[in-house]
From Swiss-Prot:
Compartments, as annotated in UniProt: Cytoplasm; Chromosome
Organism this protein belongs to: Methanopyrus kandleri (strain AV19 / DSM 6324 / JCM 9639 / NBRC 100938)
Function according to Swiss-Prot or TrEMBL: Binds double-stranded DNA tightly but without sequence specificity. Involved in DNA compaction.
Keywords, alphabetical: Chromosome, Cytoplasm, DNA condensation, DNA-binding
Molecular-function GO terms, alphabetical: double-stranded DNA binding; RNA binding
UniProt KW Cytoplasm keyword: yes
TM regions (residue ranges): none
Domain of life, per lineage: Archaea
Protein name: DNA/RNA-binding protein Alba 2
Main subcellular location of this protein, as a coarse class: cytoplasm
Family: Belongs to the histone-like Alba family.
GO CC field: chromosome; cytoplasm
Length: 93
């Protein structure tokens, strides 16, 4: 998957990310990956479900990857942050 088909989900409203996914698909992408970590995970799930249920019902969830990243804080401590990557795909025609 090309790097431009990856959408990093953060603190913006869900509709911004829905629009980004729709733009990727309308420009010819077969797959779009939503990547989020920490508190943004629920927002990434909301985006995927909104796309599937309201905007593009033909889109399927192809893959879901979950994991943990080790991040070093400014104080030098190491914390673990949960991550998710949801791959949405148009069905093959």
């Amino acid at each position: 998957m090309a790097e431009e088909n990856v959408i990093y989900v953060g603190n913006k409203p869900v509709t911004n990310y829905v629009l980004a996914v729709m733009t990727q698909f309308s420009e010819g992408a077969d797959e779009v990956k939503l990547v989020a970590r920490g508190r943004a995970i629920s927002r990434a799930v909301d985006v995927a479900e909104f796309i599937r249920n309201n905007v593009m019902p033909e889109v399927e969830v192809k893959d879901i990857e979950i994991g943990t990243e080790e991040i070093e804080t400014e104080e030098g401590d190491t914390i673990s942050v949960s991550t998710i990557a949801i791959t949405l795909a148009k069905p093959s025609e």
